[in-house]
Amino acid sequence: MIQQETRLKVADNSGAREVLTIKVLGGSGRKTANIGDVIVCTVKQATPGGVVKKGEVVRAVIVRTKSGARRTDGSYISFDENACVIIRDDKSPRGTRIFGPVARELRENNFMKIVSLAPEVI
């Protein structure tokens, strides 16, 4: 579960390495986000020469969480880290590569470009 002030690793090559959550989108009183949810973030660490700069406010979709997510068959999926992918307004990723596995829940939320770029879908 991701909430305000949570720091996440960025799992793409957009230039950002770490982001800080500002807001969870999807409802006025929504406090937490899980895999497949869109959040508003600020870039805290960035690589030189990247598309995204430090201090920039961006939107991102969560692709991995430590707390895990419950699936419809009753199983749970969890990862070793909290990670996100920076996206544009049309849900397409700003980077051209995705690093590490992503959860299958992204396919249900119509993030097909991220699913197709990912090396592994769990």
From Swiss-Prot:
GO terms for cellular component: cytosolic large ribosomal subunit. One of its GO terms (biological process) is translation. One of its GO terms (molecular function) is large ribosomal subunit rRNA binding. PROSITE patterns: RIBOSOMAL_L14. NCBIfam families: rplN_bact. Binds to 23S rRNA. Forms part of two intersubunit bridges in the 70S ribosome. Part of the 50S ribosomal subunit. Forms a cluster with proteins L3 and L19. In the 70S ribosome, L14 and L19 interact and together make contacts with the 16S rRNA in bridges B5 and B8. This is Large ribosomal subunit protein uL14.
